[in-house]
A protein has these predicted regions:
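A short acidic, helix-capping loop that chelates divalent metal ions and anchors anionic groups
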Residues: 42-46, 77-82, 118-123, 189-191, ...
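Active-site-proximal loop/turn and secondary-structure-junction residues that shape catalytic pockets
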Residues: 14-16, 40-42, 74-77, 114-118, ...
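Conserved beta-strand positions in the central sheet of alpha/beta enzyme cores
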Residues: 37, 70-72, 111, 151, ...
Length: 271
C-alpha cells in the first residue's frame, strides 16, 4: 500500500515540524485523505498566523475538499488546572484563540486536555475540580459564541485520566453539550480496557483516536508497533452508534511510511 486513503481521519502531529499546515493539507489530499484533525503548533499553524497563513490554510481546505474533524494542540504544554492563576490564564487564553481559529477554518470541535496535577505534590481533588469547572465555564461560553464543540480527551498525564472518571466529572459539571474524544491508546497505556472505555464514554463520544503503544513506554506509534489489540473496536463502535471516521494520531518521523502501513494493518481487521 503506497497511499493513506480516505478510511480514517489523519492527525497532522507528525508533520508539525516539517510542513506548514497549508502544504500538509495538499500533501494529504494527494494521498487520498478526506478528513484531517488539524494540529495547532508553532511553525505549522499557530495563533500568530492570523493573516496570510490562516487564509492559505482556508484556501487549501477549499481547494482540496478536505473536511476538518477537529483542531488539536500539544496539550502536554498547557494546563487549565495549574496551581498558578498565571499558568491557567495563559492556557485559557490560548484555548480561546484556538476556538476562534477553529471557527475560521470550519472545524466543528476543539480537543481539550482536562488539566494536570503536580505528580510530586498534587493539589487536592476539590481544588483541581474547582479550577477545571471554572475553566470550562469560560471556554464553553467562547465555544458557544463561535459554534464550536469541546471534546475532552482522556490523557495519561491528566488529573482524571480514565473513562469512568471523566464521565463522573462531566456529570458533576452538568453540561450535556460537552463530549469526549476517547483515545484508545491512552486508555491502554494506563491499564484501562479500551473496549470498556469506549462503552463507558459512549453517551458523550464525539471522536476516537487510534495509534499503538505498549504499557511500558508511552507512545503514539504506528499500528503494529505496540502490543494493542485493535480487532474488537469496529464492533464496539457499531454498538455505541458511532458513525464518524476514527482519527489516526500516529506520531512518527516517517509518516509517509507509517500512515499507509497503519491503514493497511487496520483494514485487515475490518475497518
Amino acid at each position: 500500500m503506497t497511499s493513506i486513503g480516505a478510511t480514517f481521519g489523519i492527525n497532522t502531529y507528525s508533520f508539525t515540524q516539517t510542513m506548514r499546515a497549508s502544504e500538509c493539507l495538499h500533501y494529504l489530499a494527494d494521498q487520498g485523505v478526506r478528513e484531517v484533525e488539524q494540529m495547532l503548533f508553532p511553525g505549522h499553524l499557530w495563533v500568530s498566523d492570523e493573516g496570510a497563513e490562516l487564509a492559505a490554510v482556508r484556501r487549501a481546505l477549499d481547494d482540496t475538499g478536505i473536511r476538518l474533524t477537529s483542531v488539536n494542540t500539544s496539550n502536554v504544554e498547557l494546563n487549565i488546572t495549574a496551581a498558578s492563576a498565571e499558568m491557567r490564564e495563559v492556557s485559557l487564553g490560548l484555548n480561546e484563540r484556538f476556538i476562534a481559529m477553529a471557527a475560521v477554518l470550519g472545524a466543528p470541535a476543539l480537543i481539550l486536555g482536562p488539566g494536570k496535577a503536580n505528580p510530586l505534590f498534587p493539589l487536592s481533588r476539590e481544588v483541581l475540580e474547582g479550577h477545571f469547572f471554572s475553566s470550562l465555564d469560560r471556554l464553553m461560553a467562547v465555544a458557544l459564541d463561535h459554534g464550536i464543540e469541546i471534546y475532552l480527551e482522556n490523557m495519561p498525564f491528566a488529573f482524571v485520566p480514565d473513562a469512568k472518571g471523566m464521565m463522573d466529572l462531566l456529570a458533576r459539571y452538568g453540561e450535556d453539550r460537552l463530549k469526549i474524544c476517547y483515545d484508545v491508546t491512552n486508555g491502554w497505556f494506563i491499564g484501562e480496557d479500551p473496549v470498556e472505555g469506549l462503552r463507558t464514554v459512549a453517551p458523550r463520544l464525539g471522536l476516537m483516536h487510534l495509534s499503538d503503544t505498549t504499557r511500558a513506554t508511552y507512545k503514539h506509534d504506528p499500528i503494529g508497533a505496540g502490543d494493542m489489540d485493535f480487532s474488537a473496536f469496529p464492533q464496539v463502535l457499531s454498538e455505541c452508534g458511532y458513525q464518524k471516521s476514527c482519527v489516526l494520531e500516529v506520531i512518527s518521523r516517517t509518516p509517509n511510511v507509517d500512515f499507509p502501513a497503519s491503514v493497511d494493518q487496520l483494514k485487515h481487521l475490518g475497518y
